[in-house]
Design a protein with these regions (language model features):
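Bacterial N-terminal signal peptides
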Residues: 5-14
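GH16 jelly-roll
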Residues: 18-228
Length: 228
């Protein structure tokens, strides 16, 4: 059985090894310094009205519609994918409950098993959850770390930008926070390329906790880099 192994707490201990990017080359990047989203790099995976650029940052907002609250996302779908490598972004996550920010490295939805989706999700109030959804000949299953989250200093991921990274190599998958490896998973024989997805979503299970008076509560992305 494949499992996620917690390497260290975000504020406890230091991994002395260099980050994966130190031995790789950048093959995709965006610093969001333009006037509009660069559609040669990104595909809208939701409502375009929720996506904007401001002050050199990608802003992913929520929008109220007659049928409820709607989030959105952008991804490199149909623009950039690769087999293995290191996917990295500088993100400030949402501060409140009722919706969740997402940094995801995944295969296309119609990819035949084995396939994977590797997540960093923040459910507000500094609840950051790294996890994986795997598909193989045994079916689809979700794999979560112990306690289904990480112990964080209040405001660490919701008031500051931090660097989130996901590594995919021959040995498996690993999650990095500010260049420190915090989680790893042993090998799944995924062969198809993966894309990068950045989102701010409202799911049915959490919408009851969404408080309109606390909006806007955007997810902001300062930059993205993908290495090979």
């Amino acid at each position: 059985m494949r499992s996620l192994t917690l390497i260290l707490g975000l504020l406890a201990g230091v991994l002395l090894a260099n980050p994966p990017s130190s031995t790789m080359k950048v093959v995709f990047s965006d610093d969001f310094n333009g006037d509009a989203l660069d559609e040669t790099k990104w595909t809208y995976d939701g409502n375009k009205e929720c996506i904007s650029l401001k002050g050199g940052k990608l802003i992913i907002s929520l929008k109220q519609r007659p049928d409820g609250w709607q989030g959105s996302a952008v991804s490199t779908r149909n623009k950039f994918t690769q087999v293995q490598g290191y996917f990295e972004a500088s993100i400030r996550y949402n501060g409140n409950k009722g919706h969740h920010g997402a940094f995801v490295v995944k295969n296309l939805e119609k990819t035949e098993p084995p396939a994977a989706a590797l997540y960093y999700e923040c459910f507000g109030e500094d609840k950051l959850v790294p996890w994986a959804r795997l598909a193989d000949n045994r079916g689809v299953r979700d794999v979560h770390p112990p306690k289904n989250g990480l112990n964080l200093t209040p405001g660490l991921v919701t008031k500051k930008f931090n660097t989130y990274g996901i590594l995919w190599n021959d040995r498996g998958f690993a999650w990095y926070f500010n260049d420190r490896q915090i989680l790893k998973m042993d090998k799944l024989d995924v062969k198809e390329p993966m894309l990068l997805h950045l989102g701010n979503w409202v799911s049915d299970f959490e919408v009851k906790d969404l408080v309109a008076s606390k909006l806007p509560d955007d997810v902001e992305v300062d930059w993205v880099k993908i290495y090979k």
